[in-house]
Structures are given as structure tokens and as C-alpha cells.
From Swiss-Prot:
It comes from Thermus thermophilus (strain ATCC 27634 / DSM 579 / HB8). Its main location: cytoplasm. Its EC number is 6.1.1.20. It is found in: Cytoplasm. Keywords: Aminoacyl-tRNA synthetase, ATP-binding, Cytoplasm, Ligase, Magnesium, Metal-binding, Nucleotide-binding, Protein biosynthesis, RNA-binding, tRNA-binding. This is Phenylalanine--tRNA ligase beta subunit.
Amino acid sequence: MRVPFSWLKAYVPELESPEVLEERLAGLGFETDRIERVFPIPRGVVFARVLEAHPIPGTRLKRLVLDAGRTVEVVSGAENARKGIGVALALPGTELPGLGQKVGERVIQGVRSFGMALSPRELGVGEYGGGLLEFPEDALPPGTPLSEAWPEEVVLDLEVTPNRPDALGLLGLARDLHALGYALVEPEAALKAEALPLPFALKVEDPEGAPHFTLGYAFGLRVAPSPLWMQRALFAAGMRPINNVVDVTNYVMLERAQPMHAFDLRFVGEGIAVRRAREGERLKTLDGVERTLHPEDLVIAGWRGEESFPLGLAGVMGGAESEVREDTEAIALEVACFDPVSIRKTARRHGLRTEASHRFERGVDPLGQVPAQRRALSLLQALAGARVAEALLEAGSPKPPEAIPFRPEYANRLLGTSYPEAEQIAILKRLGCRVEGEGPTYRVTPPSHRLDLRLEEDLVEEVARIQGYETIPLALPAFFPAPDNRGVEAPYRKEQRLREVLSGLGFQEVYTYSFMDPEDARRFRLDPPRLLLLNPLAPEKAALRTHLFPGLVRVLKENLDLDRPERALLFEVGRVFREREETHLAGLLFGEGVGLPWAKERLSGYFLLKGYLEALFARLGLAFRVEAQAFPFLHPGVSGRVLVEGEEVGFLGALHPEIAQELELPPVHLFELRLPLPDKPLAFQDPSRHPAAFRDLAVVVPAPTPYGEVEALVREAAGPYLESLALFDLYQGPPLPEGHKSLAFHLRFRHPKRTLRDEEVEEAVSRVAEALRARGFGLRGLDTP
């Protein structure tokens, strides 16, 4: 979650600096992934009003006449370039962060363009480049440097734990900071409502899917660009401003972790219903995609008489037909509490992950809908000139939180502390809890937005969190003679040896959760997990994992989404939970030439990862081979089972292309092995003092032929003096026949007690050649280096 410092500071004015905020949030349990400075807007970018917009005949361009403190003309190809809006104008000579070059004065289609009217991407404030950045035409005096009203911002990229959905809103973070002692300024909802009848009705046909649903009414709207301060806040938080009505709904969502949606009343009909989708129903969502709805999808629908039609996917994304437009004058404002499981399934089913669905999947304040309505409607009054009806349509009776017994003495006993009773009670009150009673047992009712506070131990944890975990006294454990753990420690020593060897080969160790998303069983084509959690931290952590590799794939995807590394080489040793609990080792390779920056040739992922495993088992003194075998989650032509000392222990291959496509990943190669590995008695063998003989062999085989089949054939035919066999080249293309590939091997022969004669080596190579030809394979050549 992106947290703009200035926005949070509006609620917590005493915040000292972004660096102090990072430290405070870390103490509260929120890790900052990175701190980013955004909006370095050059002085040469000024505010300008569009006075005129004229199409240039024969082109898609427009000639804009601007007031930028003086009248100038620019040429723009943006579709939204029109009279009556404010724009960001880069004057000639300005170097733009989004372009990396200076803006000039040029003649385009016979028009001298004095600078450039900018999109968010060109200005460097957002990713959108399909149109001009729009402002209200009276936002600033023309010619004012935009940086004066849009100063640089500091944004903290925060990791919010699944048990704290309230912290997905800036107000939730502000409340936690208030518990530390900072003053809290709650945003006001200065609403001037009118006693008016509502022109629509509400029907909730699925109360389990929508336990609390509210509709507000605003009319007389003037849809326009949002003011600069709101656009700046939304861009900093990672969202694109649309117009003042839509922006208000997004702003309040980011403030309160409560998604909402505005429907243009012209397209609602007689009212709004909440129901399950009907078989075959279709809906064009705001992203422009026509979707076939599933009968389990929860939808917001309108109706006229007996006709009912979907308006949006509840809690996920609205429909394109009822979206707010420039000529929208009246809206129905939906603010609801939806069932998290239903929203998660709908979002996954349609491949949609939105800011709204993310929050609904975690859970929203069941009593927060009416305050969010008031806040949004008050902003619509202020920014869009709306008139607002006093009445709300409301369905459902949300259950208030229950009181929890709390004993300060028990908290100290559990934590090993001596926090004063009054101090503990004060902390709970600052967190928004209602505290009743005189002690020794108090009745504490948590605020409705704290869905994670259910037990007395939860309250104890809150006391420790706000006091600071560093205030808990350290105590050395009592000393007891160490038992004889040699038999128990042996597996751990072997695991540590694996870690050491893999780290030495260039792998990075990662640790992932022991939980998995049950939906990942479908996505990765695995058997359903056997062990489901009764009280999961989040829906995506509702089962105990059965494999390690999905966690590694998730780690890779998160890193690719963040900064797109060129290569990755990861491993994990951890527990999995099947019929019985097992320890596994899994590895992942992404990118070519991983760990070989000096190599002239880039090895393919499969053979590179196989080479790493060969090196691993050579260090461990264990025999290793791969035999072709299909696995549902691996590429049909790049998958095999791993055998160690002749015993099957796992798999190696490429992630199935269909899975990679669903996850929007490039090719990824994986292995996963069951531990402990088979044992082999260690025996010292004196290294041979006699020289080795080398031969290269290139075998032409049909493209579908598994590598393991060719390798096994060569090893069997070569005889006892073949010391090693290594693939060094894989080639397809001319002059090979179509549908064939060439596998080139290094063969190393050595006798343990004497020097091999050339004729012995040639005899072994001849046996290999005959065996290959007998199988129908061809040879490209025999070479002696």
C-alpha cells in the first residue's frame, strides 16, 4: 500500500518526517518496503487554460490556444484536448522526467507549437499516457509554475499484514499513530442534506453476500476535473484521477479502507438490487471487457418492471453502461459490506484484482458504511456542487463488536512485564476501545474497524505493540544439561549442508508462509489441500501448503512486479503437509545465464538448472539422474522425475506455459525434492593419477525425444570407463532436418589404474555410435579436442 506522507500528516499533524514515520510504523508492525520521492516537477512546467481547440484538417491533431500568462499555441493529439480545461504546459527548454529529453518549439502541420501539453506519464506523475492531465480551468492563475501547487511528495510503500484490513486506509494508520501519543485530526463530514424523497428503491436478495448495504442520493452534479490537491493525493497513492465524482469515491476508499461506487441514475431504472448472476448474463465492465457472468457471482443490478439487468460485479468492478460521465447529473452512491469469500471467488474467476476487491477480500468495517457515505457526500457537495438527500436506503443489521474480558494483571503475567494498569487501559482507549468496569477484570469493546480483536490475548498483544516490544524485559532461559541429540540433529545438519552448497552455487534462500491459497491448487494443477484452517489470517492463507514451488513462484512474481530483475536463482527448505508432514527442498530459476556472468554462451533454463543439481549432488557424493515423466504443472516437453541413488525424490522442469500465462510470468524452471535424501556410505577413493581422454559427440534426434533417453543410452553403451557425460549444446535449425534437434555431449573417459589407450577410447565411442544408430538417431560428427 502506498502511503503519501503529506496525506497521512493531514490526520496526524505532529508527524516529524518520513524517516520517523517509517520507524514508528515498523514498531507498530508495518514494514516499509521502500521510500520513494515522487513529483519532481520542473519549474518550466506551468498551468495553462485551454481557450480554444481546433481540429487540424486531415489529421487527428488539434491546435490549442492556451492562456499560460500569455497566449500561446500548441499542437496536441490527445482525444480529451478541449476548450474549458486546465492543462500542464511544458515550456520550450524544459527537461521532462517522463520523457528524458528537452521540450522544443517546433512547427507541426503548419502550426508553431510553443512547448507541449502533457499527459500524466510525460509529466512523470503517473503511468497513464492516453490523454492530457486535466485540471479545473480556474485551478491556478495561468502561467503559475505547477510545482508551486504540486510540490514533491514522499511515499512509503507499506506491507500491510492480512489481519489488519483497517490499515488499508490512511485513517487506520493514523489511529494506530494516535495510540502512540500523536494527536489525531478526524476528517469532517460537513454535510448539508435535504429532506427529499429518493427516486429509486433497494432490494437485497442475497443478505449473506451483502450483510450491510447502503445507497445515498446526490443530484445537481457538475462533473469536472478534480482539484489539484485531490489529484496529487490520488496519483501519489497509485491511482489515476478520472473526474471529481469518481475521484471522491476513490479518495474516501483510500482514506477509510471502504470501497464505494457511483451509478449514473439514468441507467439504474426503478432501483438497485443485490443478487446472484443469472446463467448466461453478460456485463461490460469498466475495463472495456465483455464478461459472461457465473451464477455464483454477486452482482449489483438495476430493474425496470420485470426486467433486471446487471450494473456491476459487486465489490470488484462496476459496469461501463452506468459509469459516471461528463453529462451525469444524479447518482446513486453504493457503500456496502460484502462477504469476503464471495468477492474473492468472483475476482479470481474473472481475473480481476482491483483496489476495491483487495479490501473487500480482507474485510471492511461492518459499521463503517454510513460514516463513509456522509464523508463522500460531503465531498461531492464541496467539489461537484451536489445537492444531497438526507435519507439513505439501508439493508441489513450489522452486528456490533462484543465486549472482551481484560485483566491487566494477566497481560503482565503473559508478557513478563509490569506495565501499570492505568497505562494499559489508556492504550486501549486511545485505540478506540470502550472500557467499562473497575477491575481487576474490565469489559473492553473494540472499535468496529478492528476485525482482528476477538480474544483477551489480542488485547494483550495490542498493549505490547503500543508500549513497544523492546520494552519487554529480556530473560535468559534456565540452564539445563544438553541432552544427546546426535540422532535428532543429523537431519538438520544435512539440511544445513544443502543450504551451504546451494548458496555457494549462487542460489538465494527465501522463506515463505506455510499457508497456501486453496485456489492455488487449481491454478497450479495440484491435488486439493487436505488441511484447511478454521480461522485463517486471510482467504489466501486458508490451507497448509502441499508443495513449496508455488511459494517460490509467488516470490518471483512479486519481485518482477516491483522492479523486474533480469535473473533469479532461489531455493527454500521447508515443511509441506500431505498425508503426513514432510520436509522438501525446492528451487527456481528465472533468466538465462544465471550465475554465469562470464559465460560466452547463455545456457537454457532447463539445462542450467539441471547442471546446478548435478553440481549439488556431486558435492554430496550422490548419484543423480533425470528421467522423462509428465507432471500436470510442468511443461509437457520439459519435465522429468529426479532420481537420487536410484530412488525417486522429486521433479525438475519448466512451469507449464498455461500457468505462466495466467500468472503473467515469463518462462520459469523449477525443481522440488523430498528430504531427507537417500543415504550412501561414504568411501574414500584415491583420485586417479592417470590422464583422462575426451571426446565430443553430437547426436541428431527427433525434437520430442527426451534428453534423458539419449543420456541413458550413451551411458549404457560407453562402458565402465566413462567418467562423466555433460551436455554442452542444444541446437535446432538449418542444416538439421525439420522437426529434429542436435544434442552435443562432452565425454570424459578415465581408467582408475592406468592410462587408457586410444583404441580403447575409440572402441567405446564406436559402441555408443552403434547404439545410437540402432535406435534411429544420427551423428553430426566425432571430434577429438
